[in-house]
Amino acid sequence: MNKYELTYILKSETDEEKRNQLAEKFKGIIEADGAVENVDEWGNRKLAYEIDKRNEGYYVLVNFASSIDVPKELDRNLKIAEQVIRHMIIRIQE
């Protein structure tokens, strides 16, 4: 299994219930063929540059280990989710 780091930014006005639903959805995708090692919610932060006329976003960092198919499925779901304004999945070299 490979180790990955996922960072995603949600719209800052997303309520806590919706944030938790999305986190559980993404966690479920990962745990289907992997394991979540750490979830770190950074909260609302100023964006480095304006995205879709927004200056703030809710940052979440997830470290996980999985097969190579999971990041592809996760990427597909992150692109579909309306509340996600940006995301990035990188493989961590050991």
Curated annotation (Swiss-Prot):
GO terms for biological process: translation. InterPro entries: Ribosomal_bS6 (IPR000529), Ribosomal_bS6_sf (IPR035980), Ribosomal_S6_plastid/chlpt (IPR020814), Transl_elong_EF1B/ribsomal_bS6 (IPR014717). The keyword Ribosomal protein applies. One of its GO terms (cellular component) is ribosome. Keywords: Ribonucleoprotein, Ribosomal protein, RNA-binding, rRNA-binding. GO terms for molecular function: small ribosomal subunit rRNA binding; structural constituent of ribosome. Belongs to the bacterial ribosomal protein bS6 family. Binds together with bS18 to 16S ribosomal RNA. NCBIfam families: S6. This is Small ribosomal subunit protein bS6. The lineage of its organism: Bacteria, Bacillati, Bacillota, Clostridia, Peptostreptococcales.
